[in-house]
UniProtKB/Swiss-Prot annotation:
Name by which UniProt lists this protein: Putative sensor protein KdpD
InterPro entries: Histidine_kinase_KdpD (IPR052023), P-loop_NTPase (IPR027417), Rossmann-like_a/b/a_fold (IPR014729), Sig_transdc_His_kinase_KdpD_N (IPR003852)
CDD domains: USP_KdpD-like (cd01987)
Phylogenetic classification of the source organism: Bacteria, Bacillati, Cyanobacteriota, Cyanophyceae, Synechococcales
Gene: kdpD
Amino acid composition bias (Polar residues), ranges on this chain: 1-12
Gene3D superfamilies: HUPs, P-loop containing nucleotide triphosphate hydrolases
Family, similarity comment: In the C-terminal section; belongs to the universal stress protein A family.
Pfam families, per the entry: KdpD (PF02702)
Enzyme class: transferase
Role of this protein: Member of the two-component regulatory system KdpD/KdpE involved in the regulation of the kdp operon. KdpD may function as a membrane-associated protein kinase that phosphorylates KdpE in response to environmental signals.
């Protein structure tokens, strides 16, 4: 359950070793709002109170104030890895587990590990640490949430490649929004507190435009507020609650399938419903390597959203969708706009029109392409 801005959720050392650690996430609208500084500040306070606190991974990005705030906190040595002939540093999850502190501070939750590491993403390392009974404080920016990827692109024009599943926010014991005004953040940028001098003008003209920051700030505040409301609503429900929404996303080999899947994932999350994703493959027709990889990506993304991926072979797309909708008791279907020609639509009708006739009690969400 998420509690924005509550006191420390740290668990005393006397707790049984088999318990899961507690996770507190510091989230903000953009780099430079002060997430890492706030995390270190709370870590220092807990150390003074007698808790065993270590830094598992810290990214100061050359910010002197942040580095100063880490002084006095034990830092677990990083692990050196060789990749493409270069020596690079990564968080040493094994060393953190062996050290077994009460609390580990881990920066940049969305980071992608070096190829060859035991786990692909840093958040997976954090989940391992939590499973060992160690509490974790971590940081992330709102644009790294998987389901918001398309929306962030529309706001900023930036494609965010490092992403985490939304469930991390849902499963966190506490989420704290580290908030500053867009004007304050732009001032920090101009003072060289976020990026090097040679990158400041470019940042101000792109991601750090005032209108972008206003929209991202609203997005961060609204997302956490929605999570609090959803968790509160979930706590009030009993095991004998009414019928849950069951959302079916229909994907194809077109690139917009990723957008459809994210939209369906958000609908399922907001309605506390179950997510199903259907791919109907034509019979006696092989997918190209690119198409097969695309479908595999959709399947992986479905797992990130904790949904169920369904693959069927059929030349009757409408019939296959209707059958799955009936079998899985689907209440809502998410589809993309039809790409067929006007002549085809005039002769056979659109998939949407035919589905409306087949499934009159199911709500259809038609998502525009682009």
């Amino acid at each position: 359950m998420i509690h924005a801005g509550q006191s420390s959720s740290l668990t005393p050392a006397a707790s049984p070793p088999h318990r899961r650690g507690k996770h507190k996430i510091f989230i903000g609208m953009a780099p430079g709002v002060g997430k890492t500084y706030r995390m270190l500040e709370e870590g220092q306070q807990l150390k003074q109170e007698g808790f065993d606190v270590v830094i598992g991974l810290l990214e100061t990005h050359g910010r002197e104030e942040t580095a100063q705030k880490a002084i006095g906190l034990e830092q677990v040595p990083l692990r050196t890895m060789i990749w493409q002939g270069r020596s690079l540093l990564e968080m040493d999850t094994g060393a953190i587990l062996a050290r077994s502190p009460q609390l580990a501070l881990v920066d940049e939750l969305a980071h992608t590990n070096i190829p060859g590491a035991e786990r692909e993403k840093r958040y997976q390392d954090v989940e391992l640490i939590l499973a060992a009974g160690i509490d974790v404080y971590s940081t992330i920016n709102i644009q790294h949430l998987e389901s918001l990827n398309d929306l962030v692109y529309k706001i900023s024009g930036v494609v965010v490649r490092e992403r985490v599943p939304d469930r991390l926010l849902d499963e966190a014991d506490e989420v704290v929004v580290v908030d500053v005004t867009p004007e304050t953040l732009q001032e920090r940028l101009q003072e060289g507190k976020i990026y090097a001098q040679d990158k400041i003008n470019q940042a101000l003209q792109n991601f750090f435009k005032r209108q972008n920051l206003v929209a991202l700030r609203e997005l961060a505040l609204r997302e956490v507020a929605n999570n609090i409301e959803e968790n509160s609503r979930h706590d009030q429900q009993t095991n004998h609650c009414a019928v849950h929404e069951r959302i079916l996303v229909c994907i194809s080999t077109y690139p917009n399938s990723i957008q459809l899947l994210r939209r369906g994932g958000r609908i399922a999350s907001q309605m506390n419903g179950r997510l199903f994703v259907l791919f109907v493959a034509p019979t006696n027709q092989f997918l190209s390597k690119v198409e097969a990889l695309h479908v595999e990506t959709c399947q992986h993304l479905t797992q990130e959203f904790e949904g169920e991926f369904i693959r069927q072979e059929s030349d009757n797309v409408v019939g296959a969708i209707a059958q799955v909708a009936t079998t899985y008791r689907i209440t809502q279907i998410v589809l993309g706009e039809s790409r067929r020609s006007r002549w085809h639509l005039l002769i056979k009708g659109s998939i949407i029109q035919r589905l409306m006739r087949c499934l009159p009690t199911v709500d259809l969400h038609i998502i525009a392409n682009g």
